């Protein structure tokens, strides 16, 4: 039965007429759902569209809402008008301010020109008055000189008095007469000196080299004119002890009074003595040993732990002068090179006394005498100083010595008595290398009032000369 039904269905579906009918039914069903424009007639709207329609309907039906909307539009238009008015007003105010500024600037320029012209006129008038006053003073001095030889008459006296009164009538004459009095001159000198000192301090600060204690120059204070005591009595003064020291001494005295402490001290004394003897024996054997290994260890110890010569000299310098500074010392030497070399070439012993020792001054004077006796004169000129550096520091006896090396460029020229060039020339430039030995002079050698030691040039050596031109 089932097979028959299947065969029947297949035969029915294969018929062409039946297929056409089924197709027409399907097309008709589709066309019934679509309109002429191709869209379906039954369209479903969203929830938002319906909500917007309701709001529009309520707005159209509500007259108050329409009034508020109109008011908002009117206010917006008014605000736009206000903005335009503000723009116009700002432009007008800026133009007015610019015009006022130009007017003020022109007025200031005119006033400045007037002031400058008036100042120039006053200055020229003052200079003329000063010149006239000087001329009057010269004429008065000439008249007084002539009158001293021939005797002054009454008419000449009246002329001098009238000239002096005319001079005193002027402003500068009054000022000059007021300054001539000793009281006013002293009153003016004090603030002037104070102002000069202040200006010097400000200049030093601006240049970067503020006034410090100098290491090379020493200006002794004025001598003491008062009475000095000659009494040499010795007075014993008790030492002041603090509270802790007093408590410690009282505790130590109490402990020494106990018998236990006495026994311990008696037992410790032989032990301490024996240990000291053993340590001394070991030290003697170590120092007097002939073993090469011991000698090598001693040499290594000396090389590593021994203080160098420069360190010991610098330590001695700081012990004598705690405020010593190497950079300041080098800068002072660089400033002193030019005057010292110029004074040495000219034989100026007065200038050399400020910087050099007695031995170097004596050598300079002897050399200068020898050259002048032979008719030679040095016409050197120092051009440039550079590369000032500390070369070495060492001890010379008990005084420290610092060796400074620098180089200069100078014109080498030697003349005779007639001024003729014997050696070198005005255009011969040499590079000269110098070594200076600066020795520290103790404060006791300078005087009683000296607090810190100073440095003196003990020896000067020309290490080499190189011709440039």
Curated annotation (Swiss-Prot):
Disulphide bonds in the chain: none
Coiled-coil regions, chain positions: 60-97
Residue span of region Disordered: 133-169, 208-228
Annotated tissue distribution: Expressed in roots, flowers, young cotyledons and leaves.
Keyword terms, alphabetized: Coiled coil, Membrane, Mitochondrion, Mitochondrion inner membrane, Transit peptide
GO molecular function: ABC-type protein transporter activity
Pfam families according to UniProt: Tim44
Claim: Mitochondrion is one of the keywords in the record: yes
Induction or repression: Up-regulated after antimycin A or rotenone treatments.
Recorded superkingdom: Eukaryota
Compartments, record wording: Mitochondrion inner membrane
SMART domains for this protein: Tim44 (SM00978)
InterPro entries: NTF2-like_dom_sf, Tim44-like, Tim44-like_dom
GO biological process per UniProt: protein targeting to mitochondrion
Transit peptide: 1-44
Any Gene Ontology CC annotation: mitochondrial inner membrane
Biased composition, class Low complexity, residue ranges: 143-165
The keyword Membrane is annotated on this UniProt entry: yes
Signal peptide extent: none
Known function: Essential component of the PAM complex, a complex required for the translocation of transit peptide-containing proteins from the inner membrane into the mitochondrial matrix in an ATP-dependent manner. Recruits mitochondrial HSP70 to drive protein translocation into the matrix using ATP as an energy source.
Subunit field text: Probable component of the PAM complex at least composed of a mitochondrial HSP70 protein, TIMM44 and TIMM14. The complex interacts with the TIMM23 component of the TIM17:23 complex.
Family membership noted in the UniProt record: Belongs to the Tim44 family.
Protein name as annotated: Mitochondrial import inner membrane translocase subunit TIM44-2
